């Protein structure tokens, strides 16, 4: 409503569809693997090294997409900026997964909350003042970058026992262990979003804005399911590896 229906459709596609798809590519499906790696088969440096590679590739794919898409300059810029926003989110996810793996889930929640509040406030404030989606997107990316630096990058450096080194060949081994997870999350999200891609190609931007509002409850259900299950994964991994099967089964029953 602040920028009009057409801008709403552009943002819906840029943020919840293509941008989120690039998040999934950069994310690589590693989060569940990392937070359950309580035996530290891989170091934080291994996870971060692979995530930097996947984030870089996601940026390149996003840039290539907007080059060949035939969009106007403003739409292409908004789509690419939302790709950058989501890729920064994927990079921050590596740090937040390490917080959880080290038993500091509260830091994960704080980081996610503070980054989201900062970026959403800057985005909506800019949009309300200027009415320009492109300007608001620039502010959102800037706020996301600052939030990542303050609430992830600086925080993890204060934690003990975080191993930044990565042994030769470990990133490739980690890639091999997670490549099927990568395909599963990318293909799953494509199936989830195929209707939005079809509308974006064959209908007007304002139609996608309306469809996005109708589609939103499905996204919320999926998001809430993640909030409920994900915090328990590290505890489940610890109970399984230490042989505390009674506690393991109790958590499973509570979740069920």
PLM features: residue spans?
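Residue-level signature of transmembrane alpha-helical cores of multipass secondary-active transporters
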Residues: 16, 51, 79-82, 86, ...
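Interfacial/gating helices of multi-pass transporter permease domains
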Residues: 1-23, 76, 133-134, 138, ...
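Hydrophobic alpha-helical transmembrane segments
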Residues: 76-83, 109-159, 177, 215-218
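Membrane-interface junctions at transmembrane-helix termini in multi-pass inner-membrane proteins
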Residues: 30-42, 87-113, 134, 241
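Interhelical loop/hinge segments that connect adjacent transmembrane helices in multipass membrane
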Residues: 106, 110-111, 134-140, 149-193, ...
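Alpha-helical transmembrane segments of multi-pass membrane proteins
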Residues: 13-16, 20-25, 52, 56, ...
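Helix-loop junctions and terminal segments of transmembrane helices
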Residues: 23-42, 101, 214, 219-243, ...
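Interfacial transmembrane-helix starts/ends
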Residues: 13, 39-53, 175, 212, ...
